[in-house]
Each structure stands twice: as C-alpha cells, then as structure tokens.
Design a protein with these regions (language model features):
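Short glycine-rich, Thr/Ser-proximal phosphate-binding strand/loop in the N-terminal lobe
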Residues: 3, 12-56
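Residue-level signal for inorganic ion chemistry
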Residues: 7, 31, 85, 145
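A glycine- and small-aliphatic-rich helix-loop capping segment at beta-alpha/alpha-beta transitions
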Residues: 18-23, 98-108, 155-165, 191
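A structured beta-alpha segment of the ubiquitous adenosine-cofactor-binding alpha/beta core
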Residues: 51-78
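Short beta-strand-loop/turn "lid" adjacent to the catalytic site in phosphate-handling enzymes
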Residues: 75-120, 148-156
Length: 193
C-alpha cells in the first residue's frame, strides 16, 4: 500500500509518496508558483531529480499533473495503489487535538477557521477537494499543526488582555509547527531514552 502526504499551500503543493510496507519514501517533490505561467514542478525519484516549468493554473491542475506523472514514470501502475492522502493543515483551532479522518464536519471546521490562517486553510481545502476528485477511493486524513499544542493549560494559551476577546472572538495562542515539535520531542525520547 502507498500513502501520499501533501501540503497544499497558497501557491504550492509539496508531496511525498510512501511505500507503507517498509515506510520508505518512493518519491517526493514540490509544485511551486501555482497560478502563474512559470510554475515549477520538481520531482525526485530513484536518485534522479526532474525540474520542469509550465503553466499550472490552479491546485486541481497541479494535483492531476502530479498523479499523471506518478503513472507516466511508473512510480505507481495505477492510482488505486494510493490508499490514503495525508493533508497537512495549519490551523485546527481548539477543535482538533490529533489527526482525524476527513469528513464533512472536519471540512466545515477547517473552513470556519480560515480567518485564523487565511493563506493556508483555504489552500488546504482546495488540495483536499482536488485529491478527493482525482482518487476518490483513497482515504483522507488531516494532520493539524495546532494539535500538538492543545494540551496547554488555559493560563498558558489565554493572552493577558480582556477575557471577552477570548470568549467572544476566540483570541488565544493556538501554537504553530506542532508536527515538527511532535517529531523533535519523539526523537529526543528515542535518543535520550
């Protein structure tokens, strides 16, 4: 089985395709400058790196180009080999303290939180919909940057400003780069015992 991990940014799509039997990276790369005439598609596979420049008008086109390339290069024989898509999501607010399978409720909450990450959450949803359309049988999971920080005590995440800003407008510290913090903390445990 293969899983693809993606990070759909406002004008980019980063990806890694994993073979889950041994958790090895099969291919990785990035599509940059999406929406511009000189978009750049970089893919690394079997020790080689390919870089092409072309017009990639939106994330839907970027996702289709990526998936077509995976088949054309023989990286996958068929898109049905991809059993799941992991989507990095910047802002999960206080809703999510772990990764979740994406359903309609999750999509609605990611959309609701777009004001907290206006350059990121809308792009994540665009990427989600593009993959869902292209490989509808693959499961989809959202991995939230903010999830790692949800164990903070209220005294740590509430700003020293009038409390009504927290209750009325949800102004608080949500944390950032939690997936990296989680990895580093787990790695430290592994190394330090």
């Amino acid at each position: 089985e293969k899983i693809i991990s993606v990070n759909a940014g406002s004008s980019s799509l980063k990806f890694q395709l994993f073979e889950m039997d041994d958790e090895s990276v099969i291919t990785s790369g990035v599509i940059e400058r999406i929406g511009l005439e000189d978009s750049i598609f970089t893919i690394k596979y079997q020790g080689e790196k390919s870089v092409t420049t072309q017009n990639i008008k939106d994330h839907k086109v970027a996702v289709q180009l990526l998936l077509d390339t995976l088949v054309e290069k023989g990286i996958v024989k068929d898109l049905n080999e991809i059993k799941g898509v992991g989507h990095r999501v910047v802002q999960g607010g206080a809703y999510f303290d772990s990764s979740v399978v994406i359903d309609e409720d999750v999509v609605n909450k990611i959309d609701e939180l777009k004001s907290l990450a206006p350059l990121h959450n809308p792009a994540h949803l665009t990427g989600y919909y593009a993959f869902k359309e292209a490989i509808p049988n693959a499961g989809a999971v959202a991995v939230f940057d903010t999830a790692f920080h949800q164990t903070l005590e209220p005294r740590c995440y509430i700003y020293p400003i009038p409390y009504k800003y927290y209750t009325d407008y949800k102004v608080r510290k949500y944390g950032a780069h939690g997936t990296s913090h989680f990895y580093v903390s787990q790695r430290a445990i592994d190394l330090l015992g």
